[in-house]
From Swiss-Prot:
Keywords: DNA recombination, DNA-binding, Transcription, Transcription regulation, Translation regulation. InterPro entries: Hist_DNA-bd, Histone-like_DNA-bd_CS, IHF-like_DNA-bd_dom_sf, IHF_alpha. It comes from the Bacteria. The gene is ihfA. Heterodimer of an alpha and a beta chain. This protein is one of the two subunits of integration host factor, a specific DNA-binding protein that functions in genetic recombination as well as in transcriptional and translational control. PROSITE patterns: HISTONE_LIKE. This is Integration host factor subunit alpha. SUPFAM superfamilies: IHF-like DNA-binding proteins (SSF47729). It holds the Pfam family Bac_DNA_binding.
Length: 98
């Protein structure tokens, strides 16, 4: 199952009992705050969950898979996520679906 923003909104409605528009606004504001912080280069640290941070990747050689031609992959900035200890422990103790 994939967790979506709509699922998070529904969980907030079920647990807190606030109106849907208010729950949607809370979720949208949370994600916008994360985006804004990352856009300005600030790391986002969510206690008990993990950290989002920016990493700079250097230019490197790559290949066009169709032609085999060597092409440069440009330097870029990417978002990385590192899971916190509590999240890692929770995942480790869960049973695989199958």
């Amino acid at each position: 199952m994939t967790l979506t923003k709509a699922d998070i909104v529904e969980a907030i409605i079920a647990q807190i009992g606030i109106p849907r528009p208010e729950a949607r606004e809370i979720v949208d504001d949370l994600f916008e705050e994360i985006r804004s912080c990352l856009a300005t280069g600030e790391p986002v640290k969510l206690s008990g969950f993990g950290n989002f941070e920016l990493r700079d990747k250097n230019q490197r050689p790559g290949r066009n898979p169709k032609t085999g031609e060597e092409i440069p992959i440009t330097a870029r900035r990417v978002v990385s996520f590192k899971a916190g200890q509590k999240l890692k422990a929770r995942v480790a103790e869960s049973k695989p679906r199958g």
